[in-house]
Amino acid sequence: MAPRRPAKRLVTALCRAFSGRGCQLAPKRGAERRDAAPSRVSRFCPPRKSRHDWIGPPDKYSNLRPIHFYIPENESPLEQKLRELRQETQEWNQQFWADQNLTFHKEKEEFVRSRLKAKGLDLRTASGQKATLNAEEMAEFYKEFLSKNFQKHMYYNRDWYKRNFAITFFMGKVALERIWNKLRPKQKKTSS
């Protein structure tokens, strides 16, 4: 029996509707370029009364597990800045790896196709299975792919460290703010 699409959309809409004000999910991420990997938001939705971040199932394109961030009702501006920075970093990371994986798979298919064609072989064997190359031949592709993308990965790693240091810095500020709020003397309400 074929799956019913409208039911899936209804479940997702209901899940988001019943999640309440106290539990909002990170915004949907979108492809920024035409050749970028397509965007896909998981149907996963944390329980309505959850007061924690939840890690969802792996993304179809990036293979990373997205985090569904909990937004408390009394979130301070500093906590909001930290959460938004984490969301932005997650979206950036998801998009990078979705694009990288798409490029990898396209180039790998082209490499295999060209090598099989050079050997005079078809893409399918006589038994109908997909023809493959041996480990040594694939090692050439992996080495070439890594060499070609070295600069891109170097910039990614540099930006990844910058973002993580910024997140760690804001986490420290949030922790200090919470400690200060606990230690600060409470204002007594005066009745007139």
Curated annotation (Swiss-Prot):
N-terminal mitochondrial targeting sequence is cleaved from the mature protein once in the mitochondrion. In normal conditions, the cytoplasmic precursor protein is rapidly degraded by the ubiquitination-proteasome system (UPS). Oxidative stress induces protein stabilization and import into mitochondria where it protects COX from degradation. Induction: In conditions of increased oxidative stress, the protein is stabilized, increasing its mature intramitochondrial form and thereby protecting COX from oxidatively induced degradation. GO terms for biological process: intrinsic apoptotic signaling pathway; mitochondrial cytochrome c oxidase assembly; protein stabilization; response to reactive oxygen species. It is found in: Mitochondrion inner membrane. Residues 1-10 form a transit peptide. This is Cytochrome c oxidase assembly factor 8. It holds the Pfam family COA8. Keywords: Apoptosis, Membrane, Mitochondrion, Mitochondrion inner membrane, Transit peptide, Ubl conjugation. Belongs to the COA8 family. Required for cytochrome c complex (COX) IV assembly and function Protects COX assembly from oxidation-induced degradation, COX being the terminal component of the mitochondrial respiratory chain. InterPro entries: COA8 (IPR018796). GO terms for cellular component: matrix side of mitochondrial inner membrane; mitochondrion. It is a peripheral membrane protein.
